[in-house]
């Protein structure tokens, strides 16, 4: 039992800085929305529309680079630290290719926006301007993620936390300058949020680069100053590990975007109640997601050491801690759902809808915790292809169709409205949790030599 307590402490030591860093990242989006809204409702809506396109696009690139964390953790555990700089160099080659792709998509995003029904021309122009500004921050964001992956793979999650908060603090005055046109800058309104965010991403990368270049503990894993050509064998391995993660993230983000679009014809009360419940549950999601990152690091490190038993302990402990935390957050949500909803809106109808949906959100928090931490464990085992298939089946083949039938049709029950989609979320997330748990159990029952050979890829 003692080994599980020790492992829990190690996991929490890694997860807490990730939680704080994620809160800082979320707060940047919140600040953008509030400051754009102070100019006009159109500017705020333009930032929201632009973000709905920016987010799945950049998270695809982010997901691909998540391959670096288990690779570096495994090399660190195996005592092969001299091989780490090569992986980082190839990570930057991935960034080069991803940046071209992402900028091309965002540059042409006007075609996507023009397909939206009855969109206001001014809103569309501002949303396109926002995307054309923020797209130049994509290389900076992705370069930051490469170095963050290096640090996290070496069990150093604090730098990402510190720099994330510095980024948040810088974002506020830079937003002020470009939104309102201060100190000689043009007043860009919502478009200024894109300029500010792009600038902040580059600053965050430069700060992380400075940390990596100066930290004594990273002296042996720094990249040499000499140019290193692309190594197609290494790039193929990283893409093979990262692509399923990228696609899984993309499908997850687009799922919630599709549900938001399907809810929108149901009226203002339905949309507002859905948004309140989704916003709060997204905040709660930060906790298990951060434990999932910690699980990836610990499992990868233990497999690098050649200890499948210790990797199993890390996996079990992460899931157990996550379930305990989810039980607490579920009780918190059930008991305090009305005061929490009042923080967002005091309209009686919206309040009633939001509190009902938050009750459903509380029901899936344990399942959500198991599936996201399970995904982190599978990343540690480098079993990422299964993550893609599980999330695709659970969300798009089970959760969304069931939610659609319950919410908008009378085929199973009389149309339930937004509640139907949330029951679909429960079904999808619970299915994902069960499949993740079964996959982990199957993996851990394989011969030790097979597990270690697979982890050393």
Curated annotation (Swiss-Prot):
Membrane topology: Multi-pass membrane protein
Primary subcellular site in the record, as a coarse category: membrane
Disulfide-bond pairs as recorded: none
Compartment annotation: Cell inner membrane
Biological process according to GO: sodium ion transport; xenobiotic transmembrane transport
InterPro entries linked to this entry: MATE_fam, MATE_MdtK, MdtK-like, Multidrug-R_MdtK
Annotated protein name in UniProt: Multidrug resistance protein MdtK
Species per Swiss-Prot/TrEMBL record: Edwardsiella ictaluri (strain 93-146)
């Amino acid at each position: 039992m003692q080994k599980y307590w020790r492992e829990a402490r190690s996991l929490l030591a890694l997860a807490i800085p990730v939680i704080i860093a994620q809160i800082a990242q979320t707060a940047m989006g919140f600040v953008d929305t509030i400051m754009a809204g102070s100019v006009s409702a159109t500017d705020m809506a333009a930032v929201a529309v632009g973000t709905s396109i920016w987010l799945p696009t950049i998270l695809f690139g982010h997901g691909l680079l998540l391959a670096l964390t288990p690779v570096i953790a495994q090399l660190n555990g195996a005592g092969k630290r001299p091989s780490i700089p090569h992986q980082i160099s190839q990570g930057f080659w991935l960034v080069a290719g991803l940046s071209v792709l992402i900028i091309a998509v965002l540059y042409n995003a006007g075609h996507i926006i023009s397909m939206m029904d009855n969109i206001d021309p001014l809103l569309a122009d501002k949303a396109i301007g926002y995307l054309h500004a923020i797209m130049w921050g994509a290389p900076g964001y992705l370069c930051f993620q490469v170095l963050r992956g290096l640090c996290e793979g070496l069990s150093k999650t604090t730098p990402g936390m510190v720099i994330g908060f510095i980024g948040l603090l810088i974002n506020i005055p830079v937003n002020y300058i470009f939104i309102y046109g201060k100190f000689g800058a043009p007043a860009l309104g919502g478009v200024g949020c894109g300029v500010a965010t792009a600038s902040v991403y580059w600053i965050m990368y430069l700060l992380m680069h400075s940390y990596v270049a100066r930290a004594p503990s990273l002296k042996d894993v720094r990249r040499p100053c000499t140019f290193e050509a692309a190594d197609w064998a290494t790039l193929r391995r990283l893409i093979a590990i990262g692509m399923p993660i990228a696609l899984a993230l993309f499908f997850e983000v687009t799922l919630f975007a599709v549900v938001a679009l399907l809810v929108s014809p149901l009226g203002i009360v339905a949309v507002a109640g859905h948004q309140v419940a989704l916003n709060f549950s997204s905040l709660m999601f930060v906790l298990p997601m951060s434990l999932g990152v910690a699980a990836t690091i610990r499992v990868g490190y233990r497999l690098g050491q050649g200890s499948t038993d210790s990797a199993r302990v890390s996996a079990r402990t992460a899931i157990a801690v996550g379930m305990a935390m989810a039980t607490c957050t579920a009780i918190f949500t059930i008991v305090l759902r009305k005061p929490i909803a009042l923080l967002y809106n005091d309209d009686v109808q919206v309040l009633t809808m939001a509190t009902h949906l938050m009750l459903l959100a509380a029901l899936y928090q344990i399942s959500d915790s198991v599936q996201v931490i399970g995904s982190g464990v599978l990343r540690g085992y480098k079993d990422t292809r299964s993550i893609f298939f599980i999330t695709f089946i659970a969300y798009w083949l089970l959760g969304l169709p069931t939610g659609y039938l319950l919410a908008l049709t009378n085929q199973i029950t009389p149309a339930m409205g937004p509640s139907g989609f949330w029951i679909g979320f429960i079904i999808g997330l619970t299915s994902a949790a069960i499949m993740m748990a079964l996959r982990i159990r199957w993996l851990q029952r394989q011969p030790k030599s097979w597990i270690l050979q697979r982890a050393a890829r």
